[in-house]
């Protein structure tokens, strides 16, 4: 199979294009495929807080493959064995949580690259990513098609942001608002003025360094604000939250005493 590996999500980030995404936490291929038909530019399949197994992630990648929406996988952490598994099932774009230092970022980059550029284990003949060994020169071309995003979501990470941005192989940095606000002393309050100031400053620093800047905003006004600050890959909702809101709204139409969606915290 003479196939040229491409990653439209990465190419659009390189061009500075704005991409609007949706967080998938429902853990099913059925729900993932429904989301893929909606037209979002990218879909974050969450393995950190949602109870997704490797096989769950695999099935969701299969479900969205026929559609234009580009999948992004967030594993529970950035260990070398887990990254290897996620890449082998066909993920081309990864979002690695809780990256606090440049050394951590370099380790993650190494885990995504085959030798001599990194430490990714070789097993193309059993990997969906290589179409079970049928993609010619897979190892030679895969590095260019991988997109690696890291999450900055603590005070320590903010202190090290410039060094993280200097790491070769990092394509973008995602601001994690919930963990960041907690780390700064404002738990469940990403809207606090000090947190907002830091988010704005961080987004501008990321873009000034030539990297893509990402954010998850469950409130539309916050999403618009982040886009105005320069963020160019922004998730504007979480499927489970949207689902629960829709259920509440429908119930409120028919049962007295129900006032629609409950007020929820940040993610």
Curated annotation (Swiss-Prot):
Residues given in the record as Mg(2+) binding sites: 153, 179
Pfam families from the UniProt entry: HpcH_HpaI
Record flagged with keyword Iron: no
GO cellular component: cytoplasm
Amino acids binding substrate: 151, 178-179
The keyword Lyase belongs to this UniProt entry's keyword annotation: yes
Uppermost EC category: lyase
The family this protein is said to belong to: Belongs to the HpcH/HpaI aldolase family. KDR aldolase subfamily.
Name assigned to this protein: 2-keto-3-deoxy-L-rhamnonate aldolase
Organism: Escherichia coli O157:H7
